[in-house]
Swiss-Prot record:
GO terms for cellular component: cytoplasm. Belongs to the RRF family. Responsible for the release of ribosomes from messenger RNA at the termination of protein biosynthesis. May increase the efficiency of translation by recycling ribosomes from one round of translation to another. NCBIfam families: frr. One of its GO terms (biological process) is translation. The gene is frr. This is Ribosome-recycling factor.
C-alpha cells in the first residue's frame, strides 16, 4: 500500500460518508432524498433516478418527471413503500412531493445517526492508517527514518480526513437545527 493508495481509500470513505448523509431529511427538498428509492417497473426493480428526472421546484417541494408517463403510479407506490414519511402527489404525468418540516424527535434521531455515521467513517479512516503502518513495519526495504517519515505523513492525512468528516457532520447538524 502506497501513501497515494491510502489517500485514495480515505477519499472513498469521505465520499461514501457524504452520500450517506445527503439522504438525511433536513426539511429542505433535495433530490438525494428520493433518488435511491427503488421502483417496480417493466417487470424489474429500478432506482428512481434511472426512470425519472428529479428537480427541486421550491425549498420544500420536489418535482419528479418520469421519462415514461406510464410509470407515474409505480413511482408513487415506490415512494410510499420506502417509508420516508413523504407523500407523493400525482399530477398528470408528474409527481410532486412536499417535504414536511422535520419534528424535534426526528431531528434528534437524525443527529444521533449522523454522529454514529461520522464515527464509523473516522474509524474507517483510522483503520486505513493502521493497515498502512502495519505494512510499513513489515517492509524490510525501508530505513527507520523513512518509516517514521511515512508514518508522520499518513497521520497528517488521517487528521485531515477526520477533520473533513467532522466539518461535514457539523454542517449537516447545523442544517437540521436551523430548519
Amino acid at each position: 500500500m502506497t501513501l497515494a493508495s491510502a489517500e485514495k481509500e480515505m477519499v472513498g470513505v469521505l465520499t461514501f460518508f457524504q452520500k450517506e448523509t445527503r439522504g438525511f431529511r433536513t426539511g429542505k427538498a433535495h433530490p438525494a432524498l428520493v433518488e435511491t428509492v427503488t421502483v417496480e417497473v417493466y417487470g424489474t426493480t429500478m432506482r428512481l433516478s434511472d426512470i425519472a428526472s428529479i428537480s427541486v421546484s421550491d425549498m420544500r417541494q420536489l418535482l419528479l418527471s418520469p421519462y415514461d408517463a406510464g410509470t407515474v403510479s409505480a413511482i408513487s407506490k415506490g415512494i410510499l413503500a420506502a417509508n420516508l414519511n413523504l407523500q407523493p402527489i400525482v399530477e398528470g404525468a408528474t409527481v410532486r412531493i412536499n417535504v414536511p418540516e422535520p419534528t424535534e424527535e426526528y431531528r434528534r434521531e437524525v443527529i444521533k445517526q449522523l454522529k454514529r455515521k461520522s464515527e464509523e467513517a473516522k474509524v474507517a479512516i483510522r483503520n486505513i492508517r493502521r493497515t498502512f503502518n502495519d505494512r510499513l513495519k513489515k517492509d524490510d526495504n525501508l530505513t527507520e527514518d523513512a518509516v517514521k517519515s511515512l508514518e508522520k505523513k499518513i497521520q497528517e492525512l488521517t487528521d485531515k480526513f477526520c477533520k473533513q468528516i467532522e466539518e461535514l457532520a457539523k454542517q449537516k447538524e447545523a442544517e437540521l437545527a436551523t430548519v
